[in-house]
């Protein structure tokens, strides 16, 4: 054992043994407990960032701990390799996205290996490879034939200069992010997954996931958005509309129908189009609405605008004529593209009515509260504690009573019906992009949309294309799209859209169970052996889309007979962000020039808070921007590779696990990394001194001195605490703190005789075992140096010896009138009377009770004695 701790050599040696022995490659072992631990796979952006390191270290610690519990552990890794960044990099560097992607994968894989992750690399999947996406295409064709996937027109952001569709985040202030052109709204045919058919099951089965954070389940419930309400039908006012017809709206508040004073429709609604034909101002407003955002999030914050159409509809209960407005906050793709407006009891309608001078009719009142039509108050929208007013025959009713009575009357006249609705919309997966999975459909003039037959799959994406940012490259490649119709044999055209990259990440976890399986999407036997995933780890930012789509895909695969479980992920851990200090100078144009923390010298106060900072290069001050998520834009990232090169992977892993509980943000600290490195050097020093003196014989537990019993008790307290913290609560930081406490005890422990040294041996073995999941390389070396057989990765997690925790004597504190005045040693089995007598006889206690009358003595068993005297 080398005298100095040398992480580079130690880590290389451990990793080469794991590689040679294929230590982390797993096979199905029927009868052996399985544990499938999965961290969300990365996008191969070029290099790992600290968020990746944290995510994969957490996963690895859990996987290694479960292996020590005797389970057959699967921890795979792969690459979410399709997507826009590859196209952008390709345009910038004039290189094919495939080449850029594969080079990034090679580098990032070497980085992951240097972290010492216990990954089964034989199961690696890369989503841009045809042997992966062919099964996605196969499922697409099956679902298309069943009607679970369908084609319809969808509204997209169209860049007229680049001739391409933009994602919402690529539209900046109404203009294309690359071309700067004014973006248009366009209707184009797109493919959709009918996820709404699974809405009820996706909602209900959240209740079968106790191992998921409540916050994530709430976010999904809200996204699915089940609501109870009614469809309400307003007849057209024929005189103003010019024809007979009906306007349908869905409302969760039919109880407020008596307060409806207008209706609003989307720009694309037939009533809007009809009115605009003879009204240039309205036509211009409709064009403006169509150019606006289609994102629901933007709807909430943007200014609400509307224009009267001059048309009216008839109130189904009162017969009143209600004006029809076109409004920019009504989305055509949602419900019927129309809403009824009750300004008195809906804040958005209230603002709109006040802006355009529309009537506000109060139909609910609260006792002791005044209603004002000029100022919104939160209680106007309440359901509880209010009573209907000014509602004719519906007066004096509660929410439920009014709801039931009004819906019953609507149903009786054919003007409405109860309805349960979901906020969730079908998932549009068509992307007018190149670097994605080709959609396996052939368009034939005679036969329509024809799925590519199974024997012709995969539809391979050509990999030698360099996109230029204009239009779809595939649509310019006759060699790709020209084909024969599989049904009639006539010339036909292949679909040139590719799939949303969320599709690949919706089923990768299942492919890991049988990545080389050529007989189907997954091998059902292997899928049922490993799935569901026991522990999934990833960022909270994926709470809705990725996790919802993966749950949806799991149910699709189940219904195809590919697997039998209902949910993909049994337990979910959402790790917090990695944050760091930010520093900047304000530029003349008002912008900010950000400096990396490594280039800044800081001054701290007594509590280590940064109070001043200057740039190392010029010695001049910089502004302190506070702690923010590590990012390129704020230039506050720390390169994991530089840290691994400087300190070793174990130090980085230890710091990551010690600095914060996994679900909270972790603040980067150079001092913290230095501290982690110091601690590992201490462990190494103690082990080196111990091993250098020769390995001891077996500990004789029957003849331990009291001092030795205390040391052994500290060892087994550490085992008990760490087992709870790591195994039950994922509180790795407190488990490490417990090992540090044990190290303090072991460093002070005597090594005078064979018993002392045998006890130190047990202590060091325990430190190695408890740290093995967190710092696997140094523990690999320690285990060998301590003379243990086999590898520590194959050792069992230590068990608590309950007899070691039993204390013969207890130390109790003694208080006089609540103030600490002494300590006493008493036998563990001492009676209350014996404890009281020992406390009264304590020399210091006698001094503080002299001349006082003792009124009572309170004994808290195992803790303290309090003497009350005056």
Swiss-Prot record:
The record's section on InterPro entries has: aa-tRNA-synth_I_CS, aa-tRNA-synth_Ia, Leu-tRNA-ligase, Leu_tRNA-synth_edit, M/V/L/I-tRNA-synth_anticd-bd, Methionyl/Leucyl_tRNA_Synth, Rossmann-like_a/b/a_fold, tRNAsynth_Ia_anticodon-bd
Family membership, please give it: Belongs to the class-I aminoacyl-tRNA synthetase family.
Protein name according to UniProt = Leucine--tRNA ligase
* Highest taxon above the source species: Bacteria
Q: What would you give as a GO molecular function for this chain, any one?
A: aminoacyl-tRNA deacylase activity
GO cellular component annotations of the record: cytosol
Q: Name one Pfam family in it.
A: tRNA-synt_1_2
- Where does the chain bind ATP? 632
